[in-house]
């Protein structure tokens, strides 16, 4: 009886592990509302599903930051404002992502947008690879 229970329990654990292995772990809210809001901002800044590439995405990202009111009068990213905005969409790995923000900003209160975006984007890709896949799939639709 014990061995039957152990066998059934073991099989259930393997099934549970396999079913969770395929699930994507997202760092950011990927609700339709949030994705549509982000896509709309990028479209307002000139990036659409038809012309999206890494170069114009980075340029548009600066425009998006301006629309989100996280740039100062010198067009530098105000890190605390950026963090506040970012935290509203983070669902996992907040501590790691905020550490990435600080690292990319070199622990300064403001940062130059292009360098910061490139650094932060690379760190997000490493920390949250499934998020990039979701956003790219949504841009393609």
UniProtKB/Swiss-Prot annotation:
It comes from the Eukaryota. GO terms for cellular component: extracellular region. It is found in: Secreted. Contains 3 disulfide bonds. Keywords: Disulfide bond, Secreted, Signal, Toxin. Expressed by the venom gland. Residues 1-21 form the signal peptide. Its main location: secreted. Transmembrane segments: none annotated. The keyword DNA damage does not apply. Gene3D superfamilies: Pheromone/general odorant binding protein domain (1.10.238.20). One of its GO terms (molecular function) is odorant binding. Belongs to the scoloptoxin-17 family. This is U-scoloptoxin(17)-Er3a. It comes from Ethmostigmus rubripes.
